[in-house]
Amino acid sequence: MRLVKIGLASVNTTVGATHANVERALRFAREMAAADVTVAAYPEQMIGGYPPEDLIQWQGFVEDQWRALEHFARETREQPTVHVLGVAVLHEGLRYGCAAVVAGGEIRGLVPKEKLPTYSIYYEGRTFSRGFPYQRGEHRGVPFGDVIFRFDFGVVAPEVCEDAWTTECPMRRRTYSGAELVVNISGSAFRVGTDQTRREMLITRAGDHQCTLAYVNLVGGNDGLLFDGGGFVFQNGKLMLDAARWREGWEATTVDLDRTMRLRSENTTWRMDHTAWAASHDPVPTIEIPATEFRTRREKLTYPVPAHGSFLLPAPEKYVPARTRYCEDVLDALAMGVGDYFEKNRVFKTVGVALSGGRDSLLTLLVAHRWAARKKPDAPGSLLRAFYMPSRYSSAETEKAARTVCDELGIPLRVVSIDAAFERELEAVRAMLQPGEPLTQLTEQNIQARIRGQRMWSWSNSSGGLFLQTGNMSERAVGYTTVGGDLEGALAVIANVPKTVVMVLLDYLQETHPLEGIRLALQKPPGPELAPNQVGEEELMPFRVLDACFHLFADEKLLPEEVERVVLTMFPDLTPDVVHGYVTKFVKMFLTSIYKWVQAPLSLHIGNLDLDRERALQLPVVTHAEWALKKK
């Protein structure tokens, strides 16, 4: 047996906090070394934080990462552990994201990332250069390039995140060159369903390349990107460790690398592919780390025994319904996003939400409370502030819902009418209009929203509070929001959450954590209450139809007539004329609302589609719907 203990450390980093990030990692390094971990893996860009965006263009930022890496090496000198961690370097005038290998107080090598994602929410090709096969060099006297490492326990191949997300991956040539343990350090942002995609992809890679594959992910929120942490260890396609997500910390498992090599020798397909590859390729160079120079501590390791007491029977699994997994993932992601934005900015004293008594602001408050309950379990409400600012159009039902949920959660609520300010603003606007120019009903509605937005900013300035914006993705997509009003805030919590998902999340929360305030909010049809008897679906369309149009047009990029055909199939009770009207209305509103998206605050990203300009969907502000709505 060749037993190796693999530790996966999900570290919650802050971009730019190089030495603070290293100190967080060192705490885990000491704990893992004390637990006889042989190889410890940390996330991509762990030292500088991820994503650094254009901050990486500052040479001083990159240089400081090297100093922090040297500090990490010095502090781990006496540890019998190989550490693999992420760092950015400036090598021969180019910037690379690398996996650094540290052992025995020395930086043993740097392996640059080869696959640079420049799609969806990622822009690495903008600032980073890619490594390439058989690249060799030295960086400050340290081996740099496409290399693998031989230690006293076996051969390790470090790689970075996207390098595993393609069949043409460096893992192939490195395992054919003798690597037994592949360590993938990652900064893979959360999107709904991504965890399952990662699992399936990585277990396939470990099986295809007949290796032990250790994968660790970054955890925490940085700007609008949310990282769910966790990690896996797969041995030749068999799951050995599934580390917990949504928390900072480390987990470890022991594997027998002799088993990896035995399975290779028994797999004729792998052997023949290896022989064919070796006939036309040179092996990847191996950096030898002699045992006289560095030795791991593996004497006390024990063979991995199934916790359920059988090598033959499957381990019992706790069944979790798909809806529960979905809702918990989204809620955990959003709560972490609020908390890390609050804490990492280091300027806020409290969190504020303007409640309307409706669904969106209620969900935003519940998400903030979810974070606060973990941050301060004894008094989560002390971190939060809520405000209800009624006008003549606000209903008694929404005020009751707002008061009730705040009472139940222990959140201080202030009720401050906007009626007097509304009257003053109406008079001021009338005075600005030309004779005969009417003050429109839409203007009256927007004035109310803008008074509330202005007051929330004033509260934020005076209290040092984080002002959370409460709008959902569906209504932002079609511009059903007021610039300077309900579009205001420092952080948009649910701006990447479609309206139908908002409703599902509230239903789920009411089932799992029943509150009278949620029940009251769900009783009333959703609407902004800026005019008498205002109902959102009557002014727009049924939200299920709107979200279908949004997905098909914005995400799938279908033409309007194609959207109509799909919507008719989804909703057979609707007539073709009605569907045509809905789709036409959606496309017009969508393409004429882009100017609002670019003025919206930063939003938390949970899906593959995002309206933040620098994320997944980048559209010109000045555009026309002519191409989409030509008469056939």
Segments from the language model and where they lie:
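Enzyme catalytic cores with a strong preference for nitrogen-chemistry domains
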Residues: 1-354, 370-379, 408, 413
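ATP/NTP-dependent adenylation/nucleotidyl-transfer catalytic domains that generate, transfer
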Residues: 5, 16, 21, 152, ...
